[in-house]
């Protein structure tokens, strides 16, 4: 089974049960993959909750995704991820840099994301 990473937006939609926001291709990949999130997704979820962009806490999202889909937080060493992220010059968004870098560092794993900038700059993006 393939390992795939979830971007923050996809994690939120899945936790909210809003599958209508996902494409058939994304849903198929979710069904057929072992799912991971970068720890940076947890941090971004916390930030989004703090600024009232989402109502669920980071912990609530991650617990729900783990219980329903078996999603785990990636435990890869952080230094090699950052070594990749410093070269992701296509974005100023530190969350996107690290999330993409986690997928790259794990054998160029697919990253399920609707983010247009990520889709343009990471060849293994699934949407």
Show the residue positions of the predicted features.
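Short, well-structured N-terminal submotif of metal-dependent ribonuclease cores
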Residues: 1-37, 51-64, 106, 116, ...
């Amino acid at each position: 089974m393939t390992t795939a990473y979830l971007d923050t937006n996809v994690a939120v939609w899945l936790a909210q049960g809003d599958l209508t926001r996902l494409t058939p291709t994304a849903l198929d990949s979710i069904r057929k993959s072992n799912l991971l999130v970068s720890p940076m997704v947890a941090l971004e979820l916390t930030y989004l909750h703090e600024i009232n962009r989402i109502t669920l806490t980071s912990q609530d999202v991650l617990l729900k995704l783990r219980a329903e889909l078996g999603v785990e937080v990636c435990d890869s060493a952080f230094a090699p991820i950052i070594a990749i992220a410093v070269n992701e010059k296509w974005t100023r968004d530190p969350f996107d840099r690290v999330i993409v870098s986690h997928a790259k560092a794990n054998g160029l794993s697919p990253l399920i994301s609707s983010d247009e900038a990520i889709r343009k700059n990471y060849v293994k993006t699934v949407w």
